[in-house]
Amino acid sequence: IDKIISQGVISDSQQKIGINSGMSLGVLITKNKIALNTITSGKLICDNTLYDRYEIAKNIYISVIGPSIDDIVLLEDQWKKEMVSQNFMFRVNNKIKMTEAFEYQLMRIKSHYSPESYKICGDGDLKKYIGDLSETDGSIVNKSSISFILEYNEKKFLFLGDSVIDERFLSKLKKIVGNQYHFSAIKLPHHGSRFNITHEFIHRYTADEYYCSTNSKKYNHPDLETLAALICENTKFKKIIFNYPIKKALFLDKTQWKNKYNYDIVMGDEKNTIERNFL
């Protein structure tokens, strides 16, 4: 089990916090004896256990879109196969170690894809960077990511985690908000990866603001194909919010393009938190 944990660790050269100075979320929850999933009496949180919007605080509601129970079962099956493949077939009484191994193992078995086909170039129109967005993320780890709608003061915010936008996802979203809807904000799935979003979703579900949360170092997210599609195909004014001043954000921050396609770019500076006020 220690070997699995060590294999899942990202080296200090790749991240600022190493294994000696940080812990997985699951370990912190276990150590501090924080009760999990109280709104479902300890059961899994998925679209099967929270059918309707749930009031988590006064006038604040949450509607869970995914994962489905099928996604959770597939994740469990893959986890077991990975453990067997590493000759791990014995019982571990140390719950903290097992929790840590589970999280690190999921990091290791995530699918990896080829880099985007378009390279940043100063010439031409933004539309030339739009991709077909037809390839789909097949990672069950990402499919099992929690996605939900947060609602407050008649405003809805769509948080997509690392979710995969597929037919099941669109069907569930349609049941909650209808065939089309304009959100106050959408957190892009999987840091803006082109494998996790579709043109159909972009056309049907728009927002005042789109959030792209990544430093772009590990997988070079977001994909320019995704950003170009969001900007060019949604004609309403929108803001693309980046928490880091990444190259693709700087590339899109062109006055000519912003005027033509009715958008603005907001970038963080790594030191200060970006705050959004919708009151």
What is each PLM-predicted segment?
Residues 1-155, 239, 243, 255-279:
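Flexible, acidic/histidine-containing loops and adjacent segments that form or flank the divalent-metal
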Residues 35, 57, 85, 101, ...:
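A sequence-composition feature that detects small, non-aromatic residues
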Residues 67-68, 161-162, 190, 215, ...:
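Structural motif
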Residues 70, 194, 218, 248:
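Surface-exposed, flexible loop/turn segments at secondary-structure boundaries
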Residues 72, 157, 248-250:
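Short, surface-exposed beta-strand/loop "edge" segments at domain boundaries and coil↔beta transitions
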Residues 75, 133-214, 220-222:
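Active-site-proximal loop/helix segments of hydrolase catalytic cores
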Residues 163-185, 200-205, 220-279:
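C-terminal regulatory/interaction regions
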